[in-house]
């Protein structure tokens, strides 16, 4: 369940900014039908930063309900206060989620020892499998391979979403962890190369709109059929890049609406709607991918 194409799912909203249950069901049905390995609910792409704590939990629980056992659900549970991250994680104990994705603390920029103590404390307060999440471009904090190696010894820390885009991290981390510790790319543009170097899958933004292609690409890569996987990846490459032409999830949410997967591309402030120029850029990438 922690391999292959795992979608970092958008959180669909109605035109008033409330979570849209019908669009969420449509998205989940789409991923079930497309072969997506699992859903990450309320991560960065799911607008965790602009949902209240109650809403955060409610969206994860709604996702579980609508998934109805058809696809594994991973809860985003990151926070930059350890006690808060523990509380959020514990909310999902016995909920049915298969694990938690927990980002490094943002803004307060802890030391490597602080990162170790933070994630160790969270893991010690739950039996749920924990996926570390390193994305320094957003957090201002880079969890180094040596720290990952230490954390991999904690029994229920089972994987990392590595989103630096630095492919040398694959080798660096693999040298420090056991063979059953999973490495997941958090960067669509380098995801296939990441898998070719020994990674196990991708937690993907692109999969929101190209679920079947991402699932097939990851399947081929896992089977060592990299030439075939690269044909798909080259077709998706403009999309991998242009879904970040404006800050995520602005472009991907609009793309979901453009493809009829959600009713609106409503975001909550401070996120604002995609510009007209951004629409044209993303539309061209969707066409290149064969989605329009």
Curated annotation (Swiss-Prot):
Site (Part of a proton relay during catalysis): 44, 107
InterPro entries xrefs: Aldolase_TIM (IPR013785), DapA (IPR005263), DapA-like (IPR002220), Schiff_base-form_aldolases_AS (IPR020625), Schiff_base-form_aldolases_CS (IPR020624)
Domain of life the protein comes from: Bacteria
GO molecular function: 4-hydroxy-tetrahydrodipicolinate synthase activity
Organism per entry: Escherichia fergusonii (strain ATCC 35469 / DSM 13698 / CCUG 18766 / IAM 14443 / JCM 21226 / LMG 7866 / NBRC 102419 / NCTC 12128 / CDC 0568-73)
Encoding gene (name): dapA
Quaternary structure, from the entry: Homotetramer; dimer of dimers.
Similarity field: Belongs to the DapA family.
Pathway where this protein functions: Amino-acid biosynthesis; L-lysine biosynthesis via DAP pathway; (S)-tetrahydrodipicolinate from L-aspartate: step 3/4
GO CC term (a single one): cytosol
Main location: cytoplasm
Cellular localization per UniProt: Cytoplasm
Protein name according to UniProt: 4-hydroxy-tetrahydrodipicolinate synthase
Top EC category: lyase
Residues annotated as catalytic: 133, 161
NCBIfam families: dapA
Purpose of the protein: Catalyzes the condensation of (S)-aspartate-beta-semialdehyde [(S)-ASA] and pyruvate to 4-hydroxy-tetrahydrodipicolinate (HTPA).
Catalytic activity: L-aspartate 4-semialdehyde + pyruvate = (2S,4S)-4-hydroxy-2,3,4,5-tetrahydrodipicolinate + H2O + H(+)
Entry keywords, A to Z: Amino-acid biosynthesis, Cytoplasm, Diaminopimelate biosynthesis, Lyase, Lysine biosynthesis, Schiff base
